[in-house]
Design a protein with these regions (language model features):
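Surface segments flanking catalytic/ligand-binding clefts of nucleic-acid enzymes
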Residues: 1-98
Length: 98
């Protein structure tokens, strides 16, 4: 589904995002790996698949570290990508090109 999200964005005319990007803080410490990343906008995009409680907790901790390091984070689910792709594109477009 991450691939579908990426292609949705590309087909909508958005730039190609970096895939599985390793992000670092100002001191070059590893903060986390994200599904998609737009460096110019410091925008991380995560696709949330069906997860269990432990991975959700890890995802939340990673998101907090990313935000603390100055990244912006958007999260989408299959329901978003399949049910309302136009909204997904609009949200990302506003974040990439404010």
């Amino acid at each position: 589904m991450e691939t579908r999200l990426r292609w949705l964005l590309i087909q909508a005319g958005l730039p190609f995002p970096e895939v599985q990007a390793n992000l670092r803080d100002a001191a070059a410490r590893f903060v986390g790996r994200v599904d998609l990343y737009y460096a110019d906008a410091r925008l991380a995009i995560e696709y949330d698949g069906g997860t269990h409680r432990e991975s959700m907790a890890a995802d939340n901790r990673r998101q907090n570290r990313l935000i603390e390091a100055g990244y912006r984070v958007l999260r989408f689910t299959a329901s978003d990508v399949l049910g309302d792709p136009a909204s997904v594109v609009a949200i990302v477009r506003r974040a990439v090109d404010p």
